[in-house]
Amino acid sequence: RNVSKTFNPGTINEKAALKNLHLVLREGDFAPIVGSNGAGKSTLFNAITGAFYADRGLIMLDGEDITYQMEHVRSKVIGHLFQDPLKGTAPHMTIEENMALAYLRTTTSKNAYFSRIKAADKKKFREQLALLDMGLEDRMKQPVGLLSGGQRQALTLLMATMVTPKILLLDEHTAALDPATAEKVLSLTKKIVAERNITCLMVTHNMHQALELGNRTLMMDSGNIVLDITGEERKKMTVDDLLEQFAVRAGKALDNDRILFSKVEGSNS
């Protein structure tokens, strides 16, 4: 609610990353976000997760003011995937151990310890891994570092949603994967988000994904949301329409080469 964040204030490197940004998400909203370079997409995510505090404004989650809540407290109810598939897991720990840590991170019990993961929990881990259809349920004792990038990102997605988060943040989580693996992880994402009715924000550079996934398309520029497209308007909208509306609202054309290239790729597919 009216969130602002400025880095290096009062210096020649001053950068207003978020400018009075206002966004209300309804429960179950799945909203892809696209935007120009430096639009504030990752800054928005970092403000939500508590990586830093907003200078002004309020961040509310499920009716609770979390604006100045510690990052580790928020992590119990916020799922977050990064572009780098290596960021979400501990490579020297086994698949089972990584899942146990993710499970314990979300618990509110003060008596939850790593050694207290029960056989029933391990059985549940195995069942959840089987849903990925990657054979990881038979490799639970193997270090995560032996997995491919796609397998690690799929595992991270599973870990982030083992206990349904109040919001799931996906920061270009398929961008570093090969096309086939990216499609599989994206398919898993759609399935999990839909089945759990998870409220989700997903940064993407793919304009077609931005219009086809979820129920809402957001476009950012210069630290604010300049477009919020839903309903029938979104269903009828083409990528060219979206780019045209962005130019009108932002007062300039989109300057993200990756996004513009995805438009060409989509038209040739």
Role assignments for model-derived ranges:
Residues 235-269:
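ABC ATPase nucleotide-binding domains
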Residues 49:
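Helix-to-loop junction immediately C-terminal to a conserved catalytic motif
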